[in-house]
From Swiss-Prot:
This is Protein hairy. Its main location: nucleus. Pair-rule protein that regulates embryonic segmentation and adult bristle patterning. Transcriptional repressor of genes that require a bHLH protein for their transcription (e.g. ftz). Residues 114-143 form the Orange domain.
Length: 379
């Protein structure tokens, strides 16, 4: 039934109204058809993107889980999606249990209950019959030391919480916090707060025991020996630092920087002196350990053998024998022989061998002269 048409209308008017309604319906169908076709064509693309997002998230989860569990990524390179999700759930549950345990350990009510129970047990131990007085005293002393250690740990945790609450404070100069144990070396590094974090982390190696030796703690922070106030603050890298407030005068900042530079120069000079002393000691020790060197004379091949056998005899002869020109024979009255002049032997005229001073050396190369062979002649 077409609305707006009465019985008094002519057949032509009725036909035109029906045709117009059909045309409108066809136009609406033509408009809806492209929308549906676009949705069908975009559906595979959206599905592909969704799967890509899922795969990327799973890969990131796998990397994080392997790093958290300290496992080798090379051995677990191929993990199924179900394994990745299962490991993630287990890791989150473990973290949740650890956080709950830490909260319970830091809860003052639970700690007080634990200390009360510990004290009751210690009292019961003191009532054991048959214990020696010395042994009982040592046992009670040990138990009291244990409970005092629990109190010290509680105080340390409360202090850490107080330091964590000061993270929102603004700073101009950063100083590393004093050590929590005697084994740690105290350090000081004044750094401008407006600078980069890298510069502040690189300058935290300079030690200054003179600064943290007499630090006084107060409700408002710490006070240095020169009366300067610092506030504990946690840095982005996780370390705790003492921070100067913004109201600090510029003169005090410059004074602190000058003190730090002077102390650093003194440390460098002391290190250089220690290095020089160590080097001198090493050189002296090396000289003491070096072997003695003996001078050896140079000899030729031709005179080496002869001089080796006769040098001792020649040198032992008295020097007066070489000074005499002739030999005195016995008197003719007692002998029938005629006197005869005797020339001094060539061997006697050979002077004493004087060793020339040679350079010290462990290895001496001998100079060997090769003599030319002469042909034999009968005349």
């Amino acid at each position: 039934m077409v609305t707006g048409i009465t019985t008094t209308m002519s057949p032509n008017v009725l036909g035109t109204a029906v045709v117009s309604t059909q045309q409108q319906q066809q136009q609406q169908q033509h408009k809806e058809a492209p929308i549906k076709s676009d949705r069908r064509s975009n559906k595979p693309i959206m599905e592909k993107r969704r799967r890509a997002r899922i795969n990327n998230c799973l890969n990131e989860l796998k990397t994080l889980i392997l790093d958290a569990t300290k496992k080798d990524p090379a051995r677990h390179s191929k993990l199924e999606k179900a394994d990745i999700l299962e490991k993630t759930v287990k890791h989150l549950q473990e973290l949740q249990r650890q956080q709950a345990a830490m909260q319970q350990a830091a809860d003052p009510k639970i700690i007080n209950k634990f200390k009360a129970g510990f004290a009751d047990c210690a009292n019961e131990v003191s009532r054991f019959p048959g214990l020696d007085s010395t042994q009982r005293r040592r046992l009670l002393q040990h138990l009291s030391n244990c409970i005092n250690g629990v109190k010290t740990e509680l105080h340390h945790q409360q202090r850490q919480q107080a330091l964590a609450q000061a993270q929102s404070l603004h700073a101009q100069v950063v100083l590393p916090s004093p050590p929590s144990s005697p084994e740690q070396e105290p350090s000081v590094t004044p750094v401008a707060a407006s600078g980069n974090n890298n510069s502040s982390s690189n300058n935290t190696n300079t030690t200054a025991p003179y600064l943290f030796g007499q630090i006084q703690q107060n409700a408002n922070g710490y006070f240095l020996p020169n009366g300067m106030q610092v506030i504990p603050t946690k840095l982005p890298n996780g370390s705790i630092a003492l921070v100067l407030p913004q109201s600090l005068p510029q003169q005090q900042q410059q004074q602190l920087l000058q003190q730090h530079q002077h102390h650093q120069q003194q440390q460098q000079l002391a290190a250089a002196a220690a290095a020089a002393a160590a080097a001198a000691a090493a050189v002296a020790q090396q000289h003491q350990q070096s072997p003695l060197l003996v001078a050896m004379p140079q000899r030729t091949a031709s005179t080496g053998s002869a001089s080796s056998h006769s040098s001792a005899g020649y040198e032992s002869a008295p020097s007066s024998s070489s000074s005499r020109g002739s030999y005195a024979p016995p008197s003719p009255a007692n002998s029938a022989y005629e006197p005869m002049d005797v020339k001094p032997s060539v061997i006697q005229r050979v002077p004493h061998m004087h060793l020339e001073q040679q350079p010290l050396s462990l290895v001496i190369k001998k100079q060997i002269k090769v003599e030319e062979e002469q042909p034999w002649r009968p005349w």
